[in-house]
Amino acid sequence: MPVSIEELKALQVQKKEASKPKFISKAKRAEMAAKAKQIQKNTTSEETTLKDIRSTTDLKRSVVQETVETTKPLPSKPKPKSTSGKFSFDWSAADDTSKAYQPSYSIDSGDGQVPKRQKRDLEDAHWSDKPVESMTSRDWRIFKEDYSIVTKGGGNIPNPLRSWNECKEIPGIVRDTISRMGYKEPTPIQRAAIPIALGIRDVIGVAETGSGKTASFLIPLISYICELPKLDERSKVNGPYGLILAPTRELAMQIKDEAVKFCAPLGFKVVSVVGGYSAQEQALAVQEGAELIVATPGRLLDVIDRRLLVLNQCCYVVMDEADRMVDMGFEEQVQKVLASLPSSNAKPDSDEAENLAAVSTRRYRQTMMYTATMPVAIEKLAKKYLRRPGIVTIGSAGQAGSTVTQLVEFLNTDEKRKRRLLDIISKRQYRPPIVVFLNYKRDCEAVSDALVAAGWRTAIIHGGKQQEQREQAVQHLKRGAVDVLVATDVAGRGLDIPNVSLVVNFQMANNIESYTHRIGRTGRAGKRGTAVTFLGQEDDDVLFELKQMISRSEASPNNQELSRHPAARMKKLQQ
């Protein structure tokens, strides 16, 4: 007789009820665990074999399974060995054998995996999260890329500075001075150049303007002087221990002011030898004893020729902005000054000059040269007077800082340029101080008059001004008594005027090097700045290099009119 529909439904309900999981109560589980424990306790020592261990494990597994699964009858006796040749498992086909599997149980404690992972994590960490001892060659490569540092000069170039405290070669009293002066973190040129110089290596530093070059040579120079005997009545007549050459009076005085901050706590004396002041007074100050002299090449050579100063014990020489000294025609004077240094302490031009152990046995003269560009004349000068130098390049040689936005406009007449200049600064987008550059003294007065008529406070610097007038103009600009500085290229190099927001090249510089140094008055010390350049027909010779320079600057937009200009498409051949 066929099964009715009601019976089929009833069977389905029964199967459904039977398939529902049934959980064992806590008391029941405790009872089963007690039974298992009692069974294990009652086994004799003779039966403690591999079979007993397996049975106990199976029993524990059954407890876990019964906690999360349906209640099952106690395991049946093992099936007899099949005689049919077919393999028979010890468990039922309905059993879920993966339920009790826990991956974490498979790793034994103390297998060494955690220490290995910690070591791997340290290796994968960023260099800023590692102690300096754990830095790998890969970490140092990334570090240099982060700060746009490129070093050359053999295999003995030391790694850059990560922080001031990690450089134990700097005397403690100098590190204290660095801290008091507010130097938080080294700049890229300081990170790279200072360790090389402290290793008694000659250094060539090629860095963008406003990059912190001054401290990068003052710190190793003063650290070097700290190791020398104090000047006394007998030794001071032999001249200074250190010499710094700068192309302009303004830059020399600026370096002197910075050097005094470092030297005063150490009891060292700094004297400037520059034009615009009495040579006799300056020579007398040197003869009274000075560990460090900051000078311009022309005035220093004049004092040496008049036998008012000797450099018999000068063992540390710095040439700052060497390319500018060459551009200004001081190359011959620089060479004469260097020739007046004692030849007895010159380094050998051999591998020994790269070996710290070798050069530390004698007190050889150390030379540092800093430049923003690397023309052929500078390469020749370096080859003649520096011995196996370590070369540090920050960014690209001859390129303005990445913090300067460079803009150009084609305006052919001075009247159009004056109106545009007033239009730019009257929008108050750029806050004072502002610097306006021109090529000729006579034009400075006209531009200044136009600015004054529009209500701006101005100061003028050019070669026709007395030294005192030029210094006063710069001080007024720094104090905020003046809004706009109108200047020729005499102020284009070295002057560190804080927070210049805008540079306007009312007339384009005659060459790309001067342009680089002009716009370097803004965007200094990591701050952003803008440089606007007015162009005319007279600037065709520099348009190609100007276009190339702007195109390499990530902060500057490409100017379509400049890009399409015929003179900007091909570099003009030198006559």
Curated annotation (Swiss-Prot):
- May I have one GO cellular component term? catalytic step 2 spliceosome
Query: Per UniProt, where does ATP bind?
Result: A207, E208, T209, G210, S211, G212, K213, T214
Q: What is its EC number?
A: 3.6.4.13
Q: Does the keyword Ribonucleoprotein apply?
A: no
Q: Where is the Helicase C-terminal domain?
A: 403-565
What PANTHER family does the database record attribute to this sequence? ATP-DEPENDENT RNA HELICASE DBP3
State its role. ATP-dependent RNA helicase involved in mRNA splicing. May destabilize the U1/5'-splice site duplex to permit an effective competition for the 5'-splice site by the U6 snRNA, resulting in the switch between U1 and U6 at the 5'-splice site. May also act to unwind the U4/U6 base-pairing interaction in the U4/U6/U5 snRNP, facilitating the first covalent step of splicing.
The name this protein goes by in its record: Pre-mRNA-splicing ATP-dependent RNA helicase PRP28
From which organism does this entry originate?
Answer: Yarrowia lipolytica (strain CLIB 122 / E 150) (Yeast)
The gene is PRP28
